[in-house]
Amino acid sequence: MSDATYIEIKSLYKVFGGQPKSILPRIEAGESKQKILDETGHTVGLKDINLTIKRSEIFVIMGLSGSGKSTLVRHFNRLIEPTQGQILVEGEDVLQLNKAHLQEFRRQKMSMVFQHFGLMPHHTVLENVAFGLKTQGVAKGERNRKASKWLADVGLDGYEQQYPAQLSGGQQQRVGLARALCTDADI
């Protein structure tokens, strides 16, 4: 597989608050996050993030609690819209995708494991894992087969008809992982 650039983030900023673009000059002038928060009520989430991820590269984003890891990753598929910057996946500007193309991008290109798992409590473990395939329009038999395979791969064979509340936190996390892997998304 080629080592060509797959994801590129250029000059990404995220400011939370009522007028985020008005804060950019203060950030660029070097004012601290705390001063900006104290004086404007705006929170600087991301400041001038630039990164390149190659195809087939394992890329780790790590940092202290509250440092912006989840905020950054949620920008990749526009679960959070940036204040400024560019997000390219295979050279395509994700910020330029219309609603229909963005929905297709999210269904086909990217899967996420959320910090709090995001499991649907009134659906079985099998239904939770198969959910992404359902949104892709995969037939029920095929999605259940794939979901069962991934449940077995994460050590939860036999738990298909259980509900999330019946599982430990670690088991719930594995359900979230199986759901993300089940769609065979590129990212």
Predicted features and spans:
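Helix-to-loop junction immediately C-terminal to a conserved catalytic motif
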Residues: 77
